[in-house]
């Protein structure tokens, strides 16, 4: 493993869901990014990790493809508890209060006590759940490969509503106060009423969507397998701007201030002005980019043939870590270091 640069450890910070918070922007500009110089510890999850870890109060929750959810003490790298589900896990867990939730290939979303790992409830769909759960106002929203979006009670898992969108859903919804935004395998970006699931609008793109939307300044930002990044009016679905990259986009956008970044399968990371779509910069990172970037004060982090950090002002690579194993997971950025999991089953704390 090779890591370059230096760090000054500070206090840890929670990271409770995919891309840090329910806004799904991946924008953590309030965190001052310190570039780690070594791995403080390494934990073996027993099988590949394709989803992102989440963090709360010093416990890192990591889901492995073998179906296990691991609760790891970030101070020591030791396992506090482990829960074994009935199917593989590709979805990133989410934390809300004392609950940790995750979707599973057995078609269920599980809710566990985050302190003990005890199962509290489960909610069933009709196909695998790769979409991460979103929790807002006591309701859990998630999409399934059966083409449906589900809303269930966060307290007991009882169904509130189901909406069929017609194509498999791997995209993680964005939950606003009254609306839900999600991409679909049929190529549409849909806006649903959060209280009923009623479809308010749907905007087609030219191919399927696995990207998860971010919402900023009244715009829904999302990528499509038609090679394009889209910015849609959040109220109407009208296309404000779009930009064509060199290949399909499975990555999701990260937004910080007026800067939006997203990766493409063409091997480039792109940065745009949120409102105008003007290209600020693009940087070749040398690998197919499917994971979302994350943004902190001082760097845009992306996994592509190893973990890299780019200067948000110009896209120049300022730091990289070669961990000796392939990574598909999204990193967790905190003020005391970076946590990331690998396809080789390793979970690393970089400090």
Segments (PLM) and residue ranges:
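Blade/loop signatures of beta-propeller domains
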Residues: 4-39
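General secondary-structure propensity
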Residues: 2-8, 142, 317, 321
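Short loop/turn segments that connect beta-strands within beta-propeller blades
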Residues: 73-77, 113-116, 153-156, 193-197, ...
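Short, solvent-exposed mixed-charge patches
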Residues: 1, 350-351
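Short, glycine/acidic-enriched capping/hinge loops at junctions between secondary-structure elements
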Residues: 26-29, 66, 73
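Repeat-blade elements of multi-bladed beta-propeller folds
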Residues: 9-22, 46-70, 83-110, 122-150, ...
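A short beta-strand motif characteristic of beta-propeller blades
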Residues: 39-43, 78-83, 118-123, 158-163, ...
